[in-house]
Amino acid sequence: MITIVGSGRVGATTAAFLMFYELDNEVTLIDVIKGLPQGEALDLNHAAAILGKSVRYKGSNDYKDMEGSDIVIVTAGLARKPGMTREELAGKNAEIISSIADQIKKYAPNSIVIITTNPLDAMVYVLYKRLGFPRNRVIGFSGVLDSNRMAYYASQIIGIAPESIIPVVLGQHGENMYPVPEASFVYGKPLTEFLTQEQYNDIVKKTIQAGADITNLRGFSSNWGPAAGLALMVDSIKKNRRRVFEASVYLDGEYGVKDVFAEVPVVLGKNGVEKIIELNLTPEQRQKFMQSIEAVKKNLTQVPPQYLK
């Protein structure tokens, strides 16, 4: 069974995308708001009936209904509101994630957990510490979205399909992410060979600003892109496809970094993170990567210390 904790835009849209992959007969949506997950589940069941899909949705306000889940997706959390500091957001979401982690540990102790809650690299660290699961079973959703945004923007300039580009984005999921066009390829040729310096700079800027651009345009954050990426990750895990994704994972010496979650390429299969792929970065690339890691560490300082143990 797949459980989605949080029935807002990202959670509900992810549930809809999972319908088309038909990875499990049952998807459970859990939320603290009474009626919300039940309503989403009912609507999704109607859609599944129309499309002839076998998946059945259940909505609940009781965490016990995640019992036996092999994958849990956590989309719950507060969005940053006007006047709210980053420290306040980190503190409130850390409290929420810690509470959810306790329920996952109780009812789905063998699950693989993927989280989208922001600030991502800090919240996945909180989740990992609270769960006490092996690091391969705790994953932050980040790079799938960031790297494919970069591929999209590059494809618009080059004039090829985005899936023909192998993009690389490293480090923090946020304004200090490090897009690496020099390490991104189009059938063996570096992406930078197809771009002028001005185009290169523009792609990097657009990739970093993409989330904010969506929010500024429509008044709320992205849900379609994250949901599509989450469904693809779950597909690779459930079907043991061992596809390469970028995700925020716990580094324990990889890339010269320890005790931090950061965005790097990984192989996802039936055990969660099957392998962390270490790229051969140039000294300049490594310096930029480490600058991004410092931003991740700074985010952690905004989390109340009781949630980091």
UniProtKB/Swiss-Prot annotation:
Q: Which residues bind NAD(+)?
A: G6, S7, G8, R9, V10, G11, D31, N93, T116, T117, N118
Q: Which residues does the Swiss-Prot or TrEMBL record annotate as the active site?
A: H173 (proton acceptor)
Residues holding substrate: R80, R86, N118, R149
State if Cell inner membrane is listed as a keyword: no
Q: What EC identifiers does the entry list?
A: 1.1.1.37
Which processes are annotated in GO (biological process)? lactate metabolic process; tricarboxylic acid cycle
Q: Which PANTHER family match?
A: L-2-HYDROXYCARBOXYLATE DEHYDROGENASE (NAD(P)(+)), L-LACTATE DEHYDROGENASE
Q: Which family does it belong to?
A: Belongs to the LDH/MDH superfamily.
What protein am I looking at? Malate dehydrogenase
- Give the species: Caldivirga maquilingensis (strain ATCC 700844 / DSM 13496 / JCM 10307 / IC-167)
> What gene is behind this protein?
mdh
